[in-house]
Amino acid sequence: MSTFRQRALDEASAHAAERFFVEKRPVSAYFGENVFDLAKMRKYMSQTAYDAVIAAVKFGKKIDRAVANEIASAMKTWATEKGATHYTHLFQPLTGTTAEKHESFVTVKDGQAFERFSGSALVQQEPDASSFPSGGLRNTFEARGYSAWDPNSPVFILDETLCIPSVFVSYTGEALDMKVPNLRSIQALSSAATSVVNLFDKSVKAVSVNVGLEQEYFLVDEALYNARPDLKLCDRTVIGHTSAKDQQLSDHYFGAIPSRVEAFMKDFETEAYKLGIQLQTRHNEVAPN
């Protein structure tokens, strides 16, 4: 074994399990606390604004500018009370990652600073689309793109930033992200399904779509990661031995979860619960981890 590899193994084995986000409260006490959900909308918005958001989510109704200003003000009030200082339109471009540009709530006028967030800033941002879906040679003014608020997904706070789930389209309205095609397919499915359901019940206006969540991940110690140029450059294994196929290392579905992995899972669960993400099961995947 090379000296570099041995040093990486020694460093990895010296790392102890460590928790960073420890909550003593029951999950029900902090579930969704960082999400601007329906309950918080009722608290911070007027009934008119609340009804406008519900109509936009359920039936695709447009939100007029005056109501958008009220919604933005309510979001800003809630977010600043939670310690947020910036906001961003968060979207998933075709690069397979996320993209965002953080803007401050703070505005200075006559030497005085105050927080401001308008409806126009909530509804749309105008970023540079020349880098999507890949780095291009176009001038930025020749590649306009627009991120637009998607009210189907609730806004949330992450690292003192109000994250606004958004879609990303070109100047001509073409989809430049992963979400627009999904929303269009949901709309098409709802339209077709509603026509069928109306044969039995005329009161049905739309059909909603639900999907189950499953997230797999592989955890690699930082020392071992730094010893693998294939992981650093390609984000995948290119070199090395074939993995164990017969589960000799007890890396099966019901295998014991290592202490450091379990500590990571608990931290992940704590933050996920605060974002209103329901989690049910912890287990080893059927692969070396």
Task: Outline where the language-model segments fall.
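Short hydrophobic/aromatic-rich motifs at helix boundaries and adjacent loops
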Residues: F21-R25, M45-T48, P165, G240-H241
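Flexible inter-domain linker/hinge segments
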Residues: K24-A39, Q187, S191, S195-V197
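N-terminal hydrophobic targeting/anchoring segments and the immediately downstream early-domain regions
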Residues: S2-K24, T140-L162
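Short acidic/polar alpha-helix capping motifs at helix-coil junctions
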Residues: A14-F20, V35-K43, K179-V180
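Active-site core of metal-dependent hydrolases
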Residues: Y30-A143
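Gly-rich Lys/Arg/Thr-decorated short loops/hinges at beta-loop-alpha junctions or inter-strand turns
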Residues: P26-D37, A56-K58, G173, A244-Y253
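Glycine-rich, acidic/polar active-site loops that bind/position phosphate-bearing ligands
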Residues: A143-N289
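Generic secondary-structure boundary/loop-capping signal
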Residues: S28, T88, H102-E103, E214, ...
